[in-house]
Amino acid sequence: MADPDVLTEVPAALKRLAKYVIRGFYGIEHALALDILIRNPCVKEEDMLELLKFDRKQLRSVLNNLKGDKFIKCRMRVETAADGKTTRHNYYFINYRTLVNVVKYKLDHMRRRIETDERDSTNRASFKCPVCSSTFTDLEANQLFDPMTGTFRCTFCQTEVEEDESAMPKKDARTLLARFNEQIEPIYALLRETEDVNLAYEILEPEPTEIPALKQSKDRAATAAGAAGLAGGHHREAWTTKGPSYEDLYTQNVVINMDDQEDLHRASLEGKSAKERPIWLRESTVQGAYNSEEMKEGGIDIDSFQEHEEGHAGPDDNEEVMRALLIHEKKTPSAPAGSVGAAAPVTAANGSDSESETSESDDDSPPRVATVAAHHGEEDEEDDEFEEVADDPVVMVAGRPFSYSEVSQKPELVAQMTPEEKEAYIAMGQRMFEDLFE
């Protein structure tokens, strides 16, 4: 059962007290903001903006001043919208118990300040030296009086002192406290009337409530927007009924018509002439090393050779190069031993293997073409021979050919080499080492 002395409604005296104080000591903006909080227990900041038509920065400045003076309190609540987005809102309300205590404190502070000013004005110095600016009170007049001249002189510089007009008590200094009590009497009466008022907790800490005026205006706006939407068709949106929702801001409808794009692309291609294919795409660069006469002498049909080359150029571009290398490697073992032995000193003397390889390839070009045409079906065997030659190169020892692996296993063969053969052997080992790590 509730206590009969606890009030569940704010007394009219407390409301009048709040109005008197806010209108007597604050501006019109503060008075308007507090009037809304007097009529409505707890108001959201957005609703106050809607009612007062203030700028948000201006309203917050006013509310912060009132909150700093303990006239109002603020409560922040996190709310979840229909779309799942959480927002924070500030709710303001008046705690009347704190309001009464603040008013009592400020009035008492003002009364003490007036009494202090009145007391200081009666005890201030009344004489001042124009030279050294020393001040003296009425109680020091016996020290200032000079009986020889009958004047008041400064005790420091012996200059005649003057009355300090700025230190003279004001005419209304003694009546200021009386005037203050007379003007603040209505507030004192309201404070005495609300001295023993005990308010319930739901009045001191109210819950947020909806303002009827705003609710009616929103309902009317929603009804008008719905009627306008029906009159204008379904394509018109009722903006007032849609809250701060962001789900429709990024909705985009994109339609892609591929037929139109293909027609435009085809038309653009028809207007442009086809670019000429480069020579390395139209024909093999290796084929240029052979001429038609050499191919005829070797018994090769030029047309069939070209058809064969064109048929193999697409699937594998490296096939022609590999075939030429295989033919070259096959030709090397069939060469006379004398020619091979003569080639080694020349290679060592020139210090370059690329020149000897180039000369051999130039000398063997016609037989190579014939071999290509005659041995299309023996490529596997040639691959095996190429691997054997590549894996085990030939080294000359005293004019006789030996495999590189055999010379490496028998050091006595190295001792039988001539200086030129030894240099060729060392160079071949270096090349094999470099090829191994490339």
Curated annotation (Swiss-Prot):
Post-translational modification Phosphoserine, affected residues: S268
The HTH TFE/IIEalpha-type domain, residue ranges: 14-104
Main location: nucleus
Presence of keyword Flavoprotein: no
Zinc finger region(s), C4-type: 129-157
Biological process terms in GO annotation: transcription initiation at RNA polymerase II promoter
Residues holding Zn(2+): C129, C132, C154, C157
Entries under InterPro entries matching the protein: TFE (IPR039997), TFIIE/TFIIEa_HTH (IPR017919), TFIIE_asu (IPR002853), TFIIE_asu_C (IPR021600), TFIIEa/SarR/Rpc3_HTH_dom (IPR024550), Znf_RING/FYVE/PHD (IPR013083), Znf_TFIIB (IPR013137)
S-S pairs: none
Assembly information from the UniProt record: Tetramer of two alpha and two beta chains. Interacts with TAF6/TAFII80. Interacts with ATF7IP. Interacts with SND1. Part of TBP-based Pol II pre-initiation complex (PIC), in which Pol II core assembles with general transcription factors and other specific initiation factors including GTF2E1, GTF2E2, GTF2F1, GTF2F2, TCEA1, ERCC2, ERCC3, GTF2H2, GTF2H3, GTF2H4, GTF2H5, GTF2A1, GTF2A2, GTF2B and TBP; this large multi-subunit PIC complex mediates DNA unwinding and targets Pol II core to the transcription start site where the first phosphodiester bond forms.
Alphabetical list of PANTHER family matching this protein: GENERAL TRANSCRIPTION FACTOR IIE SUBUNIT 1, TRANSCRIPTION INITIATION FACTOR IIE, ALPHA SUBUNIT
Assigned protein family: Belongs to the TFIIE alpha subunit family.
Task performed by this protein: Recruits TFIIH to the initiation complex and stimulates the RNA polymerase II C-terminal domain kinase and DNA-dependent ATPase activities of TFIIH. Both TFIIH and TFIIE are required for promoter clearance by RNA polymerase.
Name of the molecule in the record: General transcription factor IIE subunit 1
